[in-house]
Amino acid sequence: MEYPKFKVTVSCMTFNQAKYITDAMNGFTMQQTSFPFVCTIVDDASTDGEQDVIRKYVEDNFDFSEGSVSYHKETDYAHITYAQHKTNKNCYFAVLYLKENHYSQRKPKMGYLSEWRDMCEYEAICEGDDYWIVPDKLEKQVVFLSENPDYGMCGSRAYNLTELTQKIRRAKGSYRNNDFNSVLIGGGIGTATCTVMYRLKLLKGYRDFVGSQKWLMGDFPLWLYLLRDSKIHIFDEAMVVYRILQESASHFKSYEKAKAFQDSVRSVQLYFAHAYDETAIPKIEENNFRNQFYLALSYARTKEAINYAKHVKITFKDYLIIIKSIFKRAR
């Protein structure tokens, strides 16, 4: 198959997001670009009917006429559909409907996308429950990265949509327009994953470096690897909506799951610190105790909070957060 010279691949990993995936796909197809881009949507054997939602959307909006570039094929692991949008001629979808759930088996999925991903210069990410709201997101990010070779990635501000209340507001966040060390110590880039675009060439060697690590998140170690020799820029414009669900890959009903996620963040930090900057370890540990302290408070786990408080220097700001947390729980 001869493909266009795709400049950007949009990676959308999704599972049981039947209620939300149409918003994500609308955000992709609305993108107005000066280059062709391919959206690789991987449904991880959803059980809520999401695959049917995706199929209908693709059938209704993409060109399957005689002489079109579209195709369907089956492999050992998936049913695959590739097609060009009917009206947005720069937009292509490559959809993989996986036959069995890979996440539960800890089986990697990114290798399935090499057919399209390997030819691209940049990659953007948006999971199935989030969505983009501006039509020039991809264009603006490509222009910025092409004009600023010292930057390896860029993101934007976001709106947070709380699913339980349906309230939407501009995320506050601490936006770090800087380097590897601040992201390593800070524990993140300060904005949502669905805002990000990065240079694919900077990922060379990533899989070998990570090896068999079983971290509970895929984005944070990716950001650190990208930022070893580059910087990140955050646009002040809110370009996306990040959906806050009661239970998701990074939001949890149970304290035990939330604590395990924070433990995994620390594991990533220490892994990279030992490889690149051991002087950051004391600050990483200090921040971890503080984060665990706040986490225990937010779940009303007083005993655990007291244990972590022994390692934290309590400031006036901390007391305000504690009071706010107690008041919130009391309501």
Regions found by a protein language model. Give the residues of each.
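Cell-envelope/extracellular polymer assembly enzymes that use nucleotide-activated donors
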Residues: F6-T9, V38, P221
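Short, well-formed alpha-helical segments that are part of the catalytic scaffolds
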Residues: Q17-M30, D52
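Acidic donor-binding segment of Leloir-type glycosyltransferases
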Residues: T29-L96
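A short, glycine-/small-residue-rich helix N-cap motif at loop->alpha-helix starts
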Residues: Y77-H79, N90, A94, K99-E115, ...
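Short beta-strand-to-loop acidic/aromatic patch adjacent to the donor-nucleotide binding site
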Residues: C120-D129
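Conserved donor NDP-sugar-binding/catalytic core segment of glycosyltransferases
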Residues: D136-R169
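Conserved nucleotide-sugar donor-binding catalytic segment
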Residues: S156, A171-E256
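Catalytic core of nucleotide-sugar-dependent glycosyltransferases
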Residues: W215, Y242-L245, F252-A280, T302-I314
